[in-house]
Amino acid sequence: MCGIVGAVAQRDITPILIEGLKRLEYRGYDSCGVALYMDGHLRRTRSTKRVAELSEQVAEDKLGGFTGIAHTRWATHGIPATYNAHPHFSAQGKDEPRIALVHNGIIENHEELRQELQGVGYVFESQTDTEVIAHLVNHLYAGDLFEAVQQAVRRLQGAYAIAVFCRDEPHRVVGARQGSPLVVGLGQNENFLASDALALAGTTDQIIYLEDGDVVDLQLARVWIVDQAGKQVERKAHTVQVHTGAAELGPYRHFMQKEIFEQPRAVGDTLQDIESITPELFGDGAYKVFKEIDSLLILACGTSYYAGLTAKYWIESIARIPVAVEIASEYRYRDSVPNPNALVVTISQSGETADTLAALKHVRSLGMQHTLTVCNVVTSAMVRECELAYITRAGVEIGVASTKAFTTQLTALFLLTLALAQTRGRLTEEQEAEHLKALRHLPAAIGAVLALEPQIMAWADRFASKENALFLGRGMHYPIALEGALKLKEISYIHAEAYPAGELKHGPLALVTEHMPVVTIAPKDALLEKLKSNMQEVRARGGELYVFADADSKIANAEGMHVIRMPEYYGALSPIVHTIPLQLLSYHTACVRGTDVDKPRNLAKSVTVE
């Protein structure tokens, strides 16, 4: 959610800090700020506007320096306001500020610490839990910032990534992480901190991924890391090539539109070099794990949860293995019955989703040790924590509403389905060849659906004036209806709900009027005739149907029923293909309504706090 950038160098780092914040804007924020060491003093500029305006303000204030930190904030404690924006300073009494600090996460015992610090004379200027950490570090400071931070984090309960520097030690930045991502960037006589390697693209490609409990001391020519026990540790540096072109719009109006149209490439890349189905696609030892398990437990949040629901249909019908799909934030607090023979599958675009990581640690504590993740970031915490992994190749996704990450997750989960089926003797050579042929044609099939954009834009003009919408699907297309409803509400702010079409008579039909658009996914599968009956129920109540129907489904335009014909029925992979028009409908409806498509209100791209 929030973003951190920090640096210590022998050159003016202000442009690096500002550019880093710009690269982190996609994560979502409501305020931003930068602090630097200048001529023996701490100086800062903060804003509740965009980073571009902050940059102008920094130039007007003539800020510059060799040591500093910067931050984009997403409000958790305290309203979006300049006095709550980071960086926070700490001084005792009327002294000049000595400590500057930024923080991502939530400190659960901040009220207790606040009272303690107020009792020894610290005055709070904000409503944030972050200012508590700044004052705590200052209170514990006795000439060594690294030692003060180590002492301070031992007092913190909750999740955090912090970056801090001190007026009295101007060539030093200290960072720490627990449950929130933080990376170190290595340079020549300069070093950097960030919450995401993307922030350092163009500055360094040498990245160290800190682990939970790590505290790092950055100086000009030295990086020193200690673990939770205070023991010095070595963390491997990775060469990370971040393609900065992902942050360029090109001919597109928004990043979401660009990413929708990148899906043929993203799905093709995710399938790259796959010539046959084998468990080893998911890592060494996958065959043994797949033979030992008797069920799957899928843990995910948001859009990734809907990918898991879709996979349940595939895995149970093709591989014949029972599957449970759980919302990660709920599962970890539920008194569930652990099964040590289950394969736990986590799904996350970033690999840093706090609730999913916490649920993963929870199941491992219950003795469930077979773990696999489907993730878009090879260096993420989730990949490091799991026994097996499949890395999607969606590329950087900047729009808050997930598009290409979702379809590449589905692609990877279908591969998992086939690998499980093969391991259990439920996939013949002929079936494998047929499925591989369909997968290889999938990018072209998605491209054919993207060509329907002009027709979908016409629907969006009708949708834009609505305040409610209903989405219907059956079978493996029901999770796609859920995803379609989520997309519409995320970016257009139209209230939308999704139901299995067979549930209409059990409540949702009461909402159907001539003012309620009903979006229906109508593939030519075994449930089509049942779905047609559900559609007639909507028409009989005056509802207006918007139907995505396969070409040979014999559903035609009529009064109260608008039909867009999909190019072809795509069998088991139909849910992936039917996702695309729902993305386009949501996108163009939001455009007509004039919302901030890439940065919808109140939402963040990467949810790294619980």
Swiss-Prot record:
Q: What does this protein do?
A: Catalyzes the first step in hexosamine metabolism, converting fructose-6P into glucosamine-6P using glutamine as a nitrogen source.
Which organism's genome codes for this protein?
A: Bordetella pertussis (strain Tohama I / ATCC BAA-589 / NCTC 13251)
> What is the reaction catalyzed?
D-fructose 6-phosphate + L-glutamine = D-glucosamine 6-phosphate + L-glutamate
Domain (SIS): give its ranges.
286-426, 459-600
What residues make up the catalytic site?
Answer: 2, 605
Q: What general EC class does the enzyme of this chain belong to? A: transferase
- Stated EC number for the protein is 2.6.1.16
Tell me the disulfide pairings in this chain: none
HAMAP family, from UniProt? GlmS
Q: Which GO terms describe its molecular function?
A: carbohydrate derivative binding; glutamine-fructose-6-phosphate transaminase (isomerizing) activity
Q: Mind telling me what this protein is named?
A: Glutamine--fructose-6-phosphate aminotransferase [isomerizing]
Q: Which key words are in the record?
A: Aminotransferase, Cytoplasm, Glutamine amidotransferase, Repeat, Transferase
Task: Outline the extent of the Glutamine amidotransferase type-2 domain.
Answer: 2-221
Which Pfam families does the entry mention? GATase_6 (PF13522), SIS (PF01380)
Any one of the GO BP annotations: UDP-N-acetylglucosamine metabolic process
- CC terms in the record's Gene Ontology section: cytosol
PANTHER family named among the record's database cross-references: GLUCOSAMINE--FRUCTOSE-6-PHOSPHATE AMINOTRANSFERASE, ISOMERIZING, GLUTAMINE--FRUCTOSE-6-PHOSPHATE TRANSAMINASE (ISOMERIZING)
Q: How does it assemble?
A: Homodimer.
Its subcellular locations are:
Cytoplasm
